[in-house]
Amino acid sequence: MELGKVGIWWSRPWQAEDTSVDVAAEMEALGYSALWSSGGFQPGLSTFFGHLLAATTHVVVASGIVGIWWTSPEELSKAVADLDDRYPERFLLGLGVSHAPLVEIYTRPYSHMVSYLDALDVARRVVTKDRRVLAGLGPRMLELAGERSAGAHPYFVPAEHTTRARRILGSGSLLAPQVTVVLERNPTKARDLARMFMATYLALPNYTNNLRSLGFGDDDLAGGGSDRLVDAVVCWGDLDAVVAKVREHYEAGADHVCIQVVPTSQGSFPLAEYRQLAPALLAA
């Protein structure tokens, strides 16, 4: 399965203001090589991934991520096998332990992930090591990602984390971080948009603990995030500035980046921004 260099990450409705535009098909036509979306917080594998696959012809569709608390390994394995029957070798399963505030009983997440992977291996369908990635942040989960999956899909991370992740994974594993983009050159507007996006994640201990491990302190995490934190986690500015910041992840060891655009106005899919970004990012 060839993931390519640049994918997009989007968890809200894949619907443009112009309803005649099929967003997934257009992203493929623009040259993005993978479409990532959240697996949600409900049992089962969302049927939405099948819709993305049906709307496209060759891009990889990936879950970023499916939480292991809501669906059994057997059910998930069967759902992925059903997708693979219809769209062979085009679905990449991203798995994660999610976050304690979102899970009713959140105990021993690392051990639970190990057991989950064991069960997927026993199921012997299509969710083999090379067809899955883990949402690794900390060293233990990153090590597990390298040992038991194709690699890691970290979310809400600066390039410094990409450097660390590559060191832990070694040279043979996939590293595909989510990278947040705000295509706005005004610093005040850009950081305001970034902070609105970041608010959800700064309330989740897995993310804040990870940021602390990278040297960010209480002052950085308070008040929606310091300028230093915003500038580290979010690539903002004009096109050249954004591409330069995204390139830092490649230089730090990323094989593939999953670009999540924060819209400059609330509403539908940021189609204009992804159109503007595509030629520059694909040439980076």
Region spans (language model):
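Active-site-adjacent structural elements that line small-molecule/cofactor binding pockets in enzymes
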Residues: 1-284
